[in-house]
A protein has these predicted regions:
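Phosphate-ester processing/binding pockets and catalytic centers
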Residues: 1-235
Length: 235
């Protein structure tokens, strides 16, 4: 997922202020996730760990900011089918999760980068290895694919940095948007996504290929909530 913020500094300040206000609220005094040693809400917002009362406040805050959310949704059964097909053609092929991650990053940014002279991207650290170069390579691939498809010269300068969510509040914000999307698919619980749908620009369901080989694009004019939700779809 990608969250584009007009003023990331203001978003970070507001999230930090909200967290400080909640920590100072006696209502949360003895809540485990608010204890600093737990490394959860007391340190950074994380939708999976935060209380429902906290989630609602974070979502309300996001609605006040000029942000746009984009996401690529993959059906893991389709990914498994692809892996088996690759293994059938090449017995030495071994799937690695980074392969799916990198290809999703390239898809996600393909139609975004050309809109700007320069682009600063901060991504969340995953695991212990430094994947900044791999992430940057995926962005360059996305930029080049767009240029080739539309026969245009794209010279967008790309700056990539890695951070932990505790270091970059914008990563906490995109985590909330992804959590809302995941709840829709995994639990058919759509109220969170409906609440923030005004901030959603595009959701690409890559493997919903019944009507088109490239999948389905959901947007404000084609809402995801209310669309037929297949049991096989997952993220």
């Amino acid at each position: 997922g990608l969250l584009e913020a007009d003023d990331p500094a203001a978003l970070s300040l507001d999230l930090e202020q909200l967290r400080a206000d909640l920590k100072a609220d006696p209502y949360f005094k003895n809540v485990p996730s608010f204890q600093p040693e737990r490394g959860k809400t007391a340190v950074a917002f994380h939708a999976k760990d935060d209380l429902p009362e906290v989630r609602r406040e974070v979502f309300k805050l996001l609605l006040r900011h000029a942000v746009k959310f984009y996401a690529e949704v993959r059906d893991m059964r389709a990914v498994l089918s692809y892996v088996r097909e690759r293994n059938g053609r090449n017995g030495t092929y071994r799937y690695h999760p980074n392969e799916l991650y990198d290809s999703s990053v390239a898809r996600l940014f393909k139609n975004r980068l050309h809109q700007y002279e320069s682009c600063r991207v901060c991504y969340a650290v995953r695991g212990s290895s430094d994947r900044t170069k791999s992430f940057a390579d995926s962005l360059v691939l996305a930029r080049d694919r767009f240029a080739k498809q539309w026969d245009k010269q794209v010279t967008t300068a790309i700056e990539v940095t890695a951070a932990q969510p505790v270091q970059q509040a914008g990563l906490q914000a995109v985590d909330y948007m992804l959590w809302a999307l995941q709840r829709h698919y995994a639990r058919q619980e759509s109220r969170f996504l409906e609440m923030v749908w005004d901030k959603v620009s595009l959701i690409h369901a890559v493997d919903e290929t019944d009507k088109a080989p490239y999948g389905v694009y959901y947007s404000k004019t084609k809402p995801l909530v209310g669309a037929a939700l297949k049991n096989k779809v997952g993220i």
